């Protein structure tokens, strides 16, 4: 059984960013909410869109920060502190440049890898890096100087289809995580390739 009490999907707010690669984490939380029959609603106390769901008998909070990506920790910290949720009880879904579209992987801990959303969350959790991550592959533009424009742009229809398939599989693997355990969820998700 999972000890996860908070699932976060990182994104930038606003319609202009809605389907950009950087918002892949939010796509996952939106799909998880839909599958659970929940509606994400704006909660200014936590600087984000929130929902409460039950996954295999466990009470879990969903959160999509409505701050900009580099201020995601403000939202995550506010909700985690209020409900006394420890870093190891948090799963943060985010876009991952170092994996191709169609791939998603669970991971425990680690650095921020240059991801500004993760960097701010780590800072707001008192530099505790011990939270779980769901890395959703978006691919790399090939040149470091193009990364900012790349993550803030929409994917090609082919890449979007691959990313959507990975998000769907991540949601199914989340069911395994809560019904069984992280090892089985990792095995299922890490074996998937769209």
UniProtKB/Swiss-Prot annotation:
Signal peptide: none annotated. GO terms for biological process: protein quality control for misfolded or incompletely synthesized proteins; rescue of stalled ribosome. TRNA binds at residues 17, 68, 70, 116. Its main location: cytoplasm. PROSITE patterns: PEPT_TRNA_HYDROL_1, PEPT_TRNA_HYDROL_2. The record marks 12 as: Discriminates between blocked and unblocked aminoacyl-tRNA. GO terms for cellular component: cytoplasm. Monomer. This is Peptidyl-tRNA hydrolase. It comes from Shewanella halifaxensis (strain HAW-EB4).
